[in-house]
Amino acid sequence: MDPNGKIALVTGAGRRVGRALALALGDAGCRVAVHYGQSGQDANETAALIQSMGSEAITIKADFEDPRQVESLAKSVHDQLGPIEILINNASIFDKINLANISVDNWDRHLAINLRAPFLLAQAMQAQLGDDSHGKIISLNDWRTSRPTRFAYGVTKTALSGLTRTLALSMAPNVQANEISLGAILPPSDIPVDRSRDEIKIDLGPADRMGSLNEVADAMMMLLQNDFITGETINVDGGRHIQ
């Protein structure tokens, strides 16, 4: 797929990884819908940066705990820009809570935001595209989902991998669905990064460094431009997943 002129929706695009991906899409000539939940000012800044590149950008607020707002988000993108051709599932939550302490409400919140919203958006995307159009779905995941201290996050991110593979089959051959599994990624330049290795408290893996937002964006662009990769996980983690 040539991303130029395509309509892209990036969820959670106000800051960090989501902003970097939205900016990369704008730089490639996409017309970008910048979704946000609470970070309205950040989302507006993201959209303004895209517009400064000469690409179209809009912002849309939606609370992913409410399925009606997810459906409204998809409709708003269609009404303002056209059918969603590129869906980037970046929005997620990762509350630090273990099995013994998790509540039903917290469990349901993780399911709604991390899993149900990507499903509903893919369903809406398929309906908007019709039978003859092509599209891409890329979901952001984590190289390590089995974290007892982040129980609901781990379960929903594991399920997101299953959703990605199932979408790759269900939406074939016109839509390719893949995921990017992240390791330790550098924060934006306005957040201090001069932390010692002891402060970071993570094993950086074979690469022995943190990744950059540009490297995540590069992986996304590769998946967008390659129509023969689907149902796949691209690990952008410095090799951490093989240790």
Task: Specify the residue positions occupied by each region the protein language model found.
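Conserved glycine-rich cofactor-binding loop
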Residues: G14-R16
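Substrate-binding pocket helix/loop in short-chain dehydrogenase/reductase
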Residues: N98-L99, N106-L111, D190, R197-K201
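Active-site helix of classical SDR
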Residues: A122, T156-A159, T164
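Alpha-helical segment proximal to the catalytic Tyr-Lys
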Residues: A127, L169-P173
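Short, small/polar-rich loop/turn modules that mediate ligand/substrate recognition or access, typified
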Residues: A172-Q176, T230-G231
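A glycine/serine/threonine-rich, flexible loop-to-helix segment
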Residues: E179-M210, E215
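C-terminal substrate-recognition "lid" of short-chain dehydrogenase/reductases
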Residues: R209-V236, H241
